[in-house]
């Protein structure tokens, strides 16, 4: 399934450990409910919402009740925990940040998982019963969906 198809079916996205605001803001502007797990504590969750057309975040202090999609920026060694959280939230898909842009070219925003780790990561996620995606950059897909709307 493509990134556009996956986002087209999702309404709620949990982002794990994203280091900047570009992804949650792009998803929020595209109409998604966005939550971010972003700190070392077990209850370090934020919610993104639109306030007068601008994305703003507020401390939630707990995981969301559910998420259709989990977008992770964590190393493969932590994937078991990411899968467990995704299943708890009834997510359908784990999308892991890759180094490929929506146009299919290398993306300077980075590749958290090296190419040799993507295969094992994909296997772990698929074996758990969830869908797996590693490209393209999710913010680019959200912006494209927003423009098409």
Spans of features found by a protein language model:
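Glycine-rich adenosine-cofactor-binding loop
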Residues: 8-28, 38
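NAD(P)-binding Rossmann-fold cofactor-contacting core
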Residues: 24, 28-48
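Glycine-rich, highly charged phosphate/nucleotide-binding loops
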Residues: 47-65, 71-81
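Structural motif
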Residues: 68-69, 93
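ADP-ribose/adenylate-binding Rossmann-like module
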Residues: 87-119
